[in-house]
């Protein structure tokens, strides 16, 4: 039997991304974010999520994409990275998908040149669209994840 992947899909601008659902704890609406002095540029700040303070990363900034204002559709994907809870701002969360692992192909060089290719697991072909698969464990390298709780 072919291996099946379960992914949460989301958008940043015109691109659609997917992340392993196993790393996602929850998806929340955009709360008020408290800025943190001297945090890395891609760290938007921290939020209080049911009594727990978690750092929030703006994935647009992390991927060096143009930054836009939050909308009613903006969400924070709360994930566990390196044993730490981190929120990641995305434009919209689309759906939960199941797909055959065999449908994932290597990331084309043109796509990899726009986003650090070390963040990418590959590209999945879906009905008429492409989904860029991210490796959340690499979106924030180990040292950056270790530093995040110190920010919060």
Regions of interest found by a model, annotated:
Residues 1-152:
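An acidic, low-aromatic, low-complexity terminal/linker signal
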């Amino acid at each position: 039997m072919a291996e099946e992947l379960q992914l949460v899909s989301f958008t940043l601008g015109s691109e659609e991304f997917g992340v392993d659902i196993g790393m996602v704890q929850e998806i929340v609406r955009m709360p008020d974010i408290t800025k943190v002095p001297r945090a890395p540029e891609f760290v938007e700040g921290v939020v209080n999520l049911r009594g727990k303070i978690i750092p929030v990363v703006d994935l647009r900034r992390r991927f060096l994409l143009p930054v836009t204002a939050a909308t009613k559709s903006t969400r924070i994907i709360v994930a566990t990275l390196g044993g730490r809870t981190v929120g990641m701002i995305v434009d919209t969360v689309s759906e939960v998908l199941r797909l055959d692992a065999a449908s994932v192909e290597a990331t084309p060089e043109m796509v990899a040149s726009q986003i650090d290719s070390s963040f990418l697991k590959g590209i999945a072909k879906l009905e008429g669209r492409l989904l860029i698969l991210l490796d959340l464990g690499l979106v924030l390298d180990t040292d950056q994840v270790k530093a995040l709780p110190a920010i919060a």
